[in-house]
C-alpha cells in the first residue's frame, strides 16, 4: 500500500529509489550520476507502468483519497536542446549526442552599388508594349550624361557596320513624312546645334467633333456627322476635295457651338443671320429652303453618304 502511494514520485530515473521501496527506511545517498542521454548515446527509453498497473494504482488512490491521482506519465520523447546564435554554427544536443549543424557557405558577395542608381526597364518604341530586356539605369541627378563627339566616334571606328544596319538606314530614309511633320520641321540652315536636345517630336492626337460640309467654290453647304479633328482645335485632320465640284479643298468645317451674332451659347437675338437651333447648333438651314424635304437639316446625315 505504501509503495503504491509513493510510487508516482519515484518511478522515474534520478528522482529517488526504485518502485516498491519503503520511504521510511534510510537509503544510501545516490551519487551524482550523469544523465542517461549524456552517458549512453543509444539508451533505450525507461519502462514505465503499463496500463494495467496504472489502472490498479488509480483505483487504490481513489479509495484512499479522491483528490489523489497518479502522476501523468512522461511522454516517450527525446530531449533536445538547440543553441541559437547567428554568428556561430548551430549546436544541437539530442539523445544521439552532441551534433553540429554546419551553415551553408554564403554566396559570393556582389560589389556594392550606389543607392541613387535606379534601374528599370523601358519599352522598345514610344507606343510599343514590348519591353527591352536590358535594364536602363539613370545616373545621379536623373539626367543622361552628354557624350562628346570624340567618344561617339570611337565606337563607330571600332565596330564595322553590319549589313543589317545598312538595311535599317535605307528603310528609315524611305519612310514618308506627314504634312504636319514637314511643316513643323525647321529649315536645316536655321537650326542651332545647341537646340538639338530641346527639339522633341510633337505627337498629335485626334478626336471627333460635330462638323458640317461647306464648299465656298460651288456654294454647297450640308450638315455632316462627326469629323476627325486635331485634339484641342477645330482643324480637320483628313483633308480632301469637294465631292461635287472637285475644286474646293477641305470642305469639312467645325464651328464653335454659339451664336454668330452675339457669340453666346444661349442666343436671345431677335433677328439672326440664319436659322440656328441651339440644341443642335451645327444643324443649320439656308433660308429655310430645306424644310420638309428629303435631305433636310432636321435629319442627321453623315458626310460619307452625301454625293
Curated annotation (Swiss-Prot):
Biological processes annotated in GO: negative regulation of translation; oocyte maturation; translation
Tissue expr: Expressed in oocytes.
Zn finger region (3CxxC-type): 208-293
Impact when changing residue 242 to A: Abolished binding to the 3'-UTR of mRNAs
Biased composition (Basic and acidic residues): 156-186
Ranges for region Disordered: 138-200
Molecular function in Gene Ontology: mRNA 3'-UTR binding; zinc ion binding
Main subcellular location of this protein, as a coarse class: cytoplasm
Listed InterPro entries: Zar1 (IPR026775), ZAR1/RTP1-5-like_Znf-3CxxC (IPR027377)
Gene Ontology cellular component list: cytoplasm; cytoplasmic ribonucleoprotein granule
Subcellular localization(s) per the UniProt record: Cytoplasm, Cytoplasmic ribonucleoprotein granule
This protein's UniProt keywords: Cytoplasm, Developmental protein, Differentiation, Metal-binding, Oogenesis, RNA-binding, Zinc, Zinc-finger
SMART domains: zf-3CxxC
Function of the protein: mRNA-binding protein required for maternal mRNA storage, translation and degradation during oocyte maturation. Probably promotes formation of some phase-separated membraneless compartment that stores maternal mRNAs in oocytes: acts by undergoing liquid-liquid phase separation upon binding to maternal mRNAs. Binds to the 3'-UTR of maternal mRNAs, inhibiting their translation.
Family according to the record: Belongs to the ZAR1 family.
Description of its domains: Disordered regions undergo liquid-liquid phase separation (LLPS) for the formation of membraneless compartments that store maternal mRNAs in oocytes.
Identification of the protein by name: Zygote arrest protein 2.L
Organism per entry: Xenopus laevis
Annotated gene: zar2.L
Amino acid at each position: 500500500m505504501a509503495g503504491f502511494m509513493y510510487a508516482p514520485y519515484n518511478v522515474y530515473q534520478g528522482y529517488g529509489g526504485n518502485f516498491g521501496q519503503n520511504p521510511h527506511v534510510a537509503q544510501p545517498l545516490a551519487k551524482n550520476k550523469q544523465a542517461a542521454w549524456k552517458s549512453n548515446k543509444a539508451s533505450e527509453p525507461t519502462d514505465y507502468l503499463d496500463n494495467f498497473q496504472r489502472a490498479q494504482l488509480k483505483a487504490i488512490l481513489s479509495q484512499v483519497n479522491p483528490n489523489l491521482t497518479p502522476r501523468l506519465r512522461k511522454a516517450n520523447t527525446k530531449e533536445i536542446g538547440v543553441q541559437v546564435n547567428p554568428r556561430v554554427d548551430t549546436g544541437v544536443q539530442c539523445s544521439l549526442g552532441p551534433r553540429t549543424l554546419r551553415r551553408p557557405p554564403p554566396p559570393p558577395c556582389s560589389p556594392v552599388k550606389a543607392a541613387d542608381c535606379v534601374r528599370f526597364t523601358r519599352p522598345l518604341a514610344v507606343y510599343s508594349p514590348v519591353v527591352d530586356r536590358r535594364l536602363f539605369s539613370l545616373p545621379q541627378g536623373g539626367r543622361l550624361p552628354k557624350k562628346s563627339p570624340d567618344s561617339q566616334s570611337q565606337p563607330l571606328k571600332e565596330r564595322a557596320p553590319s549589313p543589317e544596319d545598312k538595311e535599317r538606314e535605307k528603310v528609315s530614309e524611305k519612310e514618308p513624312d506627314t504634312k504636319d511633320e514637314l511643316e513643323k520641321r525647321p529649315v536645316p540652315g536655321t537650326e542651332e546645334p545647341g537646340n538639338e536636345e530641346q527639339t522633341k517630336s510633337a505627337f498629335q492626337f485626334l478626336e471627333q467633333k460635330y462638323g458640317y460640309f461647306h464648299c465656298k467654290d460651288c456654294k454647297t453647304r450640308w450638315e455632316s456627322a462627326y469629323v476627325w479633328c486635331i485634339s484641342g482645335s477645330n482643324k480637320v485632320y483628313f483633308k480632301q476635295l469637294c465631292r461635287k465640284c472637285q475644286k474646293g479643298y477641305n470642305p469639312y468645317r467645325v464651328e464653335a457651338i454659339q451664336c454668330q451674332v452675339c457669340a453666346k451659347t444661349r442666343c436671345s437675338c431677335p433677328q439672326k443671320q440664319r436659322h440656328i437651333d441651339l440644341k443642335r447648333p451645327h444643324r443649320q438651314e439656308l433660308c429655310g429652303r430645306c424644310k420638309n424635304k428629303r435631305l433636310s437639316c432636321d435629319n442627321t446625315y453623315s458626310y460619307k453618304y452625301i454625293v
